[in-house]
Amino acid sequence: MKKYASGKVREVYDLEDGRMVIVTTDRISAFDVILPTMITDKGKVLNALANFWFDYTKDIVKNHMISSDLKDMPAEFQKPEFAGRTILVKKLKMIPYEVIVRGYMFGSMYEAYKKGEPFLGHKFEKEYQQAEKLDEPIVTPSTKAAEGHDINVTLDYMK
C-alpha cells in the first residue's frame, strides 16, 4: 500500500489490487487554500455526507464505493482514529469535476451579481442582498484541478 494522493481534505491510499482507501481529515480548505486550524470530527461529517449521497444515488449513477465499514478496511485502517473517516473504493478513472449546489448569494456569485453579470449561465431577476437565501438552489460545477485552483465551469462545458 502506498499513498496515492494528498488532497486539500482527503488522503488517498492505493492498495495496489484495484482498490483504494480514502481518509477524510479534519483539515479546512477555503478558496483552494488549506487553513492552519482544524475542526474536530469535520472529516467524519464530510465522510458521512459523501457516503449518504453515494448510497442514495447508486441506482442513478455508478460510483466507486465498496464499503465504509471499518471492518472491511485493510488492517492499517482498522484503528479507532479511522472510524467514520474511511471509505474503501474501486480504483477508477476520475471524472475531474465537482458539483457545487449553491443556496445563498455569496462569494464569487455575489461579486458577479453586483456587476449585473450572469454567474456561470445563471441570471438573477430578483434583487438579492449578500448572503441572502436564493429562491431556488443552483448547480455550478467546477473542475477538480490536480494542482492549483479549481475553475468554475458551466453544465454545457461539462457535456
Language model region names:
Residues 1-142:
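Active-site loop/lid in soluble adenylation, ligation, and acyl-transfer enzymes
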Residues 133-159:
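A short mid-domain helix/strand-loop element embedded in enzyme catalytic domains
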